[in-house]
Amino acid sequence: MTRYFSRVVAVAASAAFALGHAACATGSTPSASKAATDSTTPSASASVDVKQLTVAPGKLTIATGKPAYSPWVEDDKPESGKGFEAAVAYAVAEKLGFTKDEVVWKRTTFDEAVTPGPKAWDFNLQQFSITDERKKAVDFSSPYYTTTQAVLTYKGSKIAAAASLADLKGAKLGATIGTTSLSALNKVIAPTEAAKVFNNNDDAVLALKNKQIEGLVVDLPTALYLSAAIIDNGTIIGQLADNSGGDQFGLVLQKGSKLTAPVTAAVDALKADNTLATLEKTWLSESISVPVLQ
């Protein structure tokens, strides 16, 4: 549900805005592996030669957005391994037994990646939220990241000084259609005025920039990026509690892919050895300083 970014000034890890429908607490929950596709097994069989299961034998073809933005991919160059998702991709590749030189990158739109049918890549990552509806069309690995929702506004707005959910009840708030952000807005904040719903994130951001709405609900990494680089005098009021509808991001694979189990095992191993936590701290560290609204 989100792709739009560029690294910002002294931000140890600014955040991202993914064009299209990306939505979006950091880390994974104890039951995270349940979010993966039902066909996923706990680990890959030791007898499986993963390199013979890929779309191009001996190579691992990984897809991401076009373009891809910070902090997920730095400078739109996933091959650099810089940015949270670029780094995760190479870490997964290594766990699967591929060297960096054996990784091939492709670009796709967000929507085409989660559309049913054959894929020209082995897995795709661009902040895909794991949902039951999407699992009907594609496979997911276990989650590599979980994010909360946040409320973004601009300095001088009626809600700029809001310190609680109650302070937001009467505000003009908006979010993108079909996102966890919109669901959290309606269920957690439950504003007295109907939420403004936008067809895409670009429209939502433009509405906030033009002060047609007073606050925008997006995933926290996106809010951090927008406040620093896109919205003039942008400010984050706070994030919603962990249980308020955080998205779990998973790697997308073709439905029924023989790589789903090995890739999930790789993600689980990266979680177990704290690699994911280390990469999160490196690229998404700003998230921890945003207050939680109660």
Tell me the role of every PLM-derived stretch.
Residues K51, T180-K196, T235-I236, V267-Q294:
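Ligand-binding clefts/hinges and TM-proximal coupling segments of bilobed small-molecule sensing domains
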Residues E102-L165:
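Acidic, polar ligand-binding/catalytic clefts
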